[in-house]
Every structure is written in structure tokens, then in C-alpha cells.
Amino acid sequence: IKEPIPGLDIPELVRYGKERNVGLVLWTLWNPLDKELDEILDVYEKWGIKGIKVDFMQRSDQYMVNFYERVGKAAMERKLLVDFHGSFKPSGLQKKYPNVMTFEGVLGLEHDKDSRDINPVHDLILPFTRMVAGPMDYTPGAVNNATAEDFYINFVHPISLGTRAHQAALYVVYESPLQMLADSPSNYYKAPEFASFISRIPTIWEDTKAITAKIGEQLVIARKNGKNWYLAGLTDWNARNIEVKLDFLEASKYKMEIFKDGVNADVYASDFKTEEVMVSKDELINITMAKGGGWAAILTPVE
């Protein structure tokens, strides 16, 4: 993992990305890193890499816990961020080493390739369980979406259970300072409205309001970044209409850009609708979600 394959010029990719304000994070196996940690990270630093995603640890014995500590420290010394994939749940390492951004430690979206267990009910259990421990690299963002009736396991072209609006809402609900896009670039090119919307959702928050929540069933949450608020709802396999009072807002008027389930989302899970409305902080709004659905909005104050 210190030498790229022939034809792959990583320093050139770093240069190309830098011109476009994009940094590169390299995925790496844990075992080679364990054996040559300093040597490998020195190479990555020299290339201009911004961070590493370490994978397949799959253990939590003392040796492995020490490995996490070594990686966090060595990466910090080289100003590299770290994402521990294939990991145990966080236990505070990100407080000691702020360059440690996030951890998997969860049955995430990637397992839709081989299971029906990653579904809207599962998604609504995680905020009350795994997320309590710290940042969670669930890897949301599926573009191929299916109802419970239409879902089938497809390892080559994975499909998510629940609606596309459900996937959009996960970026607000799930906390991870380094968020992932789970799907292929080709699929995002085919879904520009979805890609554009989730690209505008921050990954760090100044304030959070739990509006309503019931484990495994439904929730609505509001988060703040700068002057903007981000509102999201999730539901299980039951369609819901939830009234939300916007009294948590500070300014009097906001532009609310909504990404929600389309009229046919209960039978075609990829169906969505976007709309833009003006709202005030004393308003009561309705969040309508299809079965397995979701709802997300960006609220920008209007001067």
C-alpha cells in the first residue's frame, strides 16, 4: 500500500484535486499499516494525501485498541484525518485526537448488498443506540431505492430499502464529521437534484433539537450550522404526517428548500419531489412521509 498500481499517478491526482478544492482520502487495510505505520504515513504525507480510511480491523482486543491509538497519534502528527471503518464503536478517541473523524461500528448501508436487515426500522433504531456512542460512518446516499415489496438483493448494483427522501434525511439525522456517498459516481450524475441537495448538508452542527422521536418508528430532528437550520424526518414502514412547530428558529422569515417523498413513493421508492416555500418561526408545518420514507429541508434566513 506504499506503491500505486502502474498507470495510477497519485501525486498528479492530488494536484488535480487541489486545483478544484478537493482533497484525497485513501482507503487502506489495517494489517500493512500496523506493520509499517510511520513509513506508510510518511509516503502518504509526501504525496499530499489528506487522510486515510482504515478497514477490516473487526476486533476489539487490547492489541487492536492500542492500534487505533497509534494510528490516531501518527496521523495527527502528519495532519491526516482518520476514518476507522470495519471498527468497534467509538469510546472517546476522537476527543484525544480530533483528526479521528468517525467510526463505522454499525450495520451500515453497504450490507444491503447481502441482507434485508438494513431497512427503515433499523435506521430508526440507530439514533437511540449506536449513535449515542459517537460519530457513525453509516455511509448513506443510495440512489437505487425500493419498497419492501420490490426489494431484492443485488451485490453488483446495490439497492436500499426505503425511499430516496429517506436517504436524503439520513445526512441530517446521522452524525459524522466525515460523511460518505455510498453509491457510484455514475448514479449521482443520473440524480443531479439528489446529489446537489445532499452536497449542501453540513457535517458538523452547532445545535440540535429533537422535535419528536420513537425508537424504531419515527423521528423529526432539527440541526443548526451557521445561520441555517436543517430539518429532517424519518419513518418506518408506516406512512406518516407529523406536525412540526418552527418555534426553534431565530429569524422571523426563512426560505425552506424541501426534498420529500413523491406522490408515488409508496410504490416507486425513488420518486421524490422538491419544493421551495417561505416560512416563519411561528408556523406549524406538516411533514408527510410515505412508508419507508423521509423528509429533509434546508432553512435559510431571509433578511
Residue ranges: model-predicted function:
Residues 276-303:
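C-terminal beta-strand-rich structural cap/linker in extracellular carbohydrate-active enzymes
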Residues 148-168, 172-174, 179, 224-229, ...:
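Long hydrophobic segments that form regular secondary structure
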Residues 55, 258-282:
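Solvent-exposed beta-strand/loop surfaces of large extracellular or lumenal domains
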Residues 183-230, 264-270:
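Glycan-recognition and catalytic regions of carbohydrate-active enzymes
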Residues 248-262:
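Solvent-exposed beta-hairpin/edge-strand motifs
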Residues 215-251, 295-296:
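Carbohydrate-binding surface patches
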Residues 80-86, 110-113, 177-191, 205-209, ...:
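Acidic/polar loop patches that form or flank catalytic/metal-binding clefts of enzymes
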Residues 1-159, 163:
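Aromatic- and carboxylate-enriched substrate-binding clefts and catalytic-loop regions
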